[in-house]
């Protein structure tokens, strides 16, 4: 339950998409004092056919006009580049696969935007995330969204208690089809707009083309765990563990998957078959821990997601030090990827998590 008085002054993050549009319309309908903010987190290039920022801003302005609220366009591009994009490049250059959307929420949407909103006199910010929040005895709990296919608590796990206290998620108790229906009822121009996909600053452009603009590439061998060369990769950063498509390996038999990266030799290790043992792990070590509650969860049994939309996996949490923890799973987990986030849950409560550093999967190549 989102606990706010309808005398609250709320600023909504309007992205130009259907979810934030309905968020603003619902709050306005419920009698809140509502304003909108469109966050420009990436510098728009008029010659960039893939960048949707300009159209998104037009859509956000049109929504604000129909809902009957004021809207500001605020540029956070410098902060985004410093806090999110630099990290994105650093992780890829180190051979890991980062999730910039997680960092964007913690550093931009619920920090820069929150600071801006408070400076403008807002009591609360609202976003179109599919998540819920409940206050119990003065403590704000982040919960999974009711629509389990759209639940976005995974991307919000790095929010701190002070950020949760000032945020509400009006769509948390709704399912996506209902949101689309409400958008049509409100006559919003975004009612039929396609959901955005991919990393926000990349948009729909080819990932390889984008990354090559910022990081040097180095081709190398594609090898089996036994050391047999079966192809050539175009740069380790373009591949992620568990990847099947785009490997360019033909022949008979089961499909090939990326199992590991050997950064020292610049080799991509691939295995045949979805159920190959090298694609599974029973434990992981995560660092850069972040929790949503005032006190970190005690060591013990929880469930975990190591990627978005996966089923919750039962596990045991053990702290190695203040910034590092180990998770041991009841069952082997497929394609656990360094750089991604491991997020802990106690039933529906999102407790927080950390960045996956290593797994117990052997990476020593036998030759």
Swiss-Prot record:
Keyword Transferase recorded: yes
Residues reported to bind ATP: 13-20, 39, 128
Annotated region (Interaction with tRNA), positions in chain: 150-152, 307-308
UniProt organism field: Neisseria gonorrhoeae (strain ATCC 700825 / FA 1090)
Enzyme class of the recorded protein, top EC level: transferase
Coiled-coil regions listed in the entry: none
Site feature: Interaction with tRNA: 129, 340
Protein name (record): tRNA-specific 2-thiouridylase MnmA
Subcellular location: Cytoplasm
Family, similarity comment: Belongs to the MnmA/TRMU family.
EC number: 2.8.1.13
GO MF annotation: an example: ATP binding
Active site annotation, chain numbering: 104 (nucleophile), 200 (cysteine persulfide intermediate)
Task of the protein: Catalyzes the 2-thiolation of uridine at the wobble position (U34) of tRNA, leading to the formation of s(2)U34.
Keyword annotations of the record: ATP-binding, Cytoplasm, Disulfide bond, Nucleotide-binding, RNA-binding, Transferase, tRNA processing, tRNA-binding
Stretch list, region Interaction with target base in tRNA: 99-101
This protein's record includes keyword Disulfide bond: yes
Cysteine-cysteine disulfides: 104-200
Catalysed reactions listed for this entry: S-sulfanyl-L-cysteinyl-[protein] + uridine(34) in tRNA + AH2 + ATP = 2-thiouridine(34) in tRNA + L-cysteinyl-[protein] + A + AMP + diphosphate + H(+)
Cellular component per GO, a single term: cytoplasm
Pfam families per UniProt: tRNA_Me_trans, tRNA_Me_trans_C, tRNA_Me_trans_M
GO biological process: one example: tRNA wobble position uridine thiolation
